[in-house]
């Protein structure tokens, strides 16, 4: 998994080693039979705060009841255009979400290309995989991959992504150079959730933020 995540090229940009995103995939196996596994996955990513040694959580998502097959020494292959395996699709899907979330904190809606590719992965996986984990009804039909990428690619939720952008770039990143302005911007960003909640109550992206 480590090789798969670090050796695949997820964007058209080039990055130095220290620019790589600090993230983790915690996979807890809850059932298995031969090479077939059922697991819960917790995905975390962190973002450095400008001019500090502090990292802040940027993305946390728990995906319960995922299914995949894996044999010892099996290569995990990724393709942008076709389904290879559930494990490959899972790892690629969340890798792109992590990168998209990171980009969104530096420029408004900058992660949309990654989100669109993640949606493409979900679409072809739901067509060719026998697993129900790609469907909108997975995990009770609310907190799942389908609705996550639906929210991230919809213009209806741009205001929530803008809150995340302002919270990080105009808030946390300014704390060292101008803490008063930074705190004001952080408060303003969080207060915007109250306005957003009137139109999009308890949305999935709001739940992820907190």
Question: For the regions a protein language model found, what residue spans apply to each?
Answer:
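Flexible, glycine-rich surface segments
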Residues: 110-208
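Start-of-domain marker
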Residues: 2-51
């Amino acid at each position: 998994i480590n090789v798969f995540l670090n050796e695949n090229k997820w964007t058209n940009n080039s990055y130095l080693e220290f620019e790589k995103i600090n993230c983790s995939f915690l996979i807890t196996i809850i059932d298995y039979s031969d090479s077939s596994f059922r697991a819960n996955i917790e995905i975390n990513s962190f973002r450095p705060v400008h001019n500090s040694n502090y990292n802040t959580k940027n993305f946390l998502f728990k995906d319960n009841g995922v299914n995949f097959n894996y044999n010892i020494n099996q290569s995990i292959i990724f393709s942008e255009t076709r389904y290879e395996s559930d494990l490959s699709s899972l790892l690629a899907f969340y890798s792109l979400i992590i990168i998209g979330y990171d980009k969104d904190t530096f420029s408004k809606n900058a992660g949309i290309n990654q989100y669109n590719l993640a949606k493409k992965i979900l679409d072809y996986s739901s067509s060719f995989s026998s697993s129900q984990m790609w469907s909108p009804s997975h995990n009770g039909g609310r907190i799942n991959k389908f609705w996550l990428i639906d929210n991230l690619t919809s213009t209806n939720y741009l205001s929530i992504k803008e809150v995340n952008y302002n919270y990080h770039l105009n808030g946390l990143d300014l704390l060292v150079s101008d803490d008063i302005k930074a705190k004001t911007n952080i408060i303003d960003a969080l207060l915007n959730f109250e306005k957003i909640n009137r139109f999009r109550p308890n949305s999935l992206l709001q739940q992820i933020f907190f």
